[in-house]
């Protein structure tokens, strides 16, 4: 709500943000894990796909402007057997349709070079360098 209000105020709109509880963020609609999604999993052509990609692209500049922690650390979707590799290929296809840049399918060995503690059972992964994290608190 506050990010939407901020953007509307920049367009000279009169805005009020109302909180349901006695303190801010007590009435969140679901949860906040601090993940900035790259947008590879959203159904192509949906508003969610558009907003995931656009929001991810905006986050670095916004974090500098508003002075909050943000790290573009990328994300991995792990594949533990060859039978599941088509699922990675489907995610890669969605990523391309959604305009997520830099996604690729990498080998299990490449995953372990990035994250040495990853299980030896991992055979491949979708790597999305646009994924990131923020501190939600």
Regions from the PLM with identified roles:
Residues 29, 52, 135-136:
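Short, conserved glycine- and acidic-residue-centered signature motifs
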Residues 34-114:
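Dinucleotide-binding Rossmann-like beta1-alpha1 core, especially the glycine-rich loop
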Residues 69-78, 112-137:
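Helix-loop-beta segment of a Rossmann-like dinucleotide-binding subdomain
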Residues 11-13, 64, 116:
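Proline-centered flexible-loop/turn and helix-kink motifs
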Residues 15-16, 34, 124-125:
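Structural motif
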Residues 2:
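Residues forming the Rossmann-fold NAD(P)(H) cofactor-binding site
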Residues 9-31:
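Glycine-rich FAD pyrophosphate-binding loop
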């Amino acid at each position: 709500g506050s990010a939407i209000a901020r953007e509307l105020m920049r367009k000279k709109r009169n805005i009020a943000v109302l909180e349901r509880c006695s303190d801010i963020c007590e009435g969140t609609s679901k949860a906040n894990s601090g993940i900035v999604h790259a947008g590879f999993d959203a159904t192509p052509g949906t508003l969610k796909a558009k907003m995931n990609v656009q929001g991810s692209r905006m986050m670095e500049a916004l974090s500098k402007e508003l002075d909050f922690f943000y790290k573009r650390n990328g994300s991995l979707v792990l594949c533990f057997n060859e039978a599941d590799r088509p699922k990675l290929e489907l995610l890669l296809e969605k990523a391309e349709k959604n305009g997520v840049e830099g996604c690729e399918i990498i080998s299990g060995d490449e995953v372990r070079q990035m994250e040495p503690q990853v299980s030896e059972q991992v055979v491949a992964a979708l790597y999305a360098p646009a994924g990131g994290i923020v501190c939600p608190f």
